[in-house]
Each structure stands twice: as structure tokens, then as C-alpha cells.
Amino acid sequence: MLEPLTNPQIRKFKAAAQLLEPMLKVGKAGLSEGFIRTVSATLDQHELVKIKFAEFKEQKKELAPLLAEKTGSHLVMRVGNVMVLHRPKPEA
């Protein structure tokens, strides 16, 4: 279980996300198991991941928190058709 993010952490992650380009896109397959695995692997490498909704734009309010839950990450923000997830890197 992840610890909730503090307000200073949220501000820090939002600022860092401004500089990121979307790394992944939610496409026609939606939140398939393969996409969820890809997001999880990307979070393992980068901690902070920006994802764009290319499809399913009408359901983004429901899908964003669902993706965060399925990947064990925090939904830092969702603005327009973009969301940002954060998960600390696993300790080696």
C-alpha cells in the first residue's frame, strides 16, 4: 500500500511533469492487461509517467484512477486528455 502523497510532493511532481512529453498513449485497446504491464514497467524505470488519452477520452475521469489502482501508483494529476502517474522505484 502506498503512502498518500503530501502537498509538497504533489507540487514537485506536477512541476516535473510539465517538462515531460507523454510516454504512453491509451489507444483503441484501452486499459488492456498488456497496456497495464507496459505502464507498470515504465513506472519501474521512470517513477513519473505522463500518459495521453488518444482514445476513450469520454471515460478518462473513470479510467485514470482505475489505471493508478491497477499499477499501484498515485494519480498525480489529470488535465485535459493527459494524466500523470507516480510510483517510487522498487528498492534493489
How does the language model describe each region?
Residues 1-92:
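Positively charged, polar, low-complexity stretches
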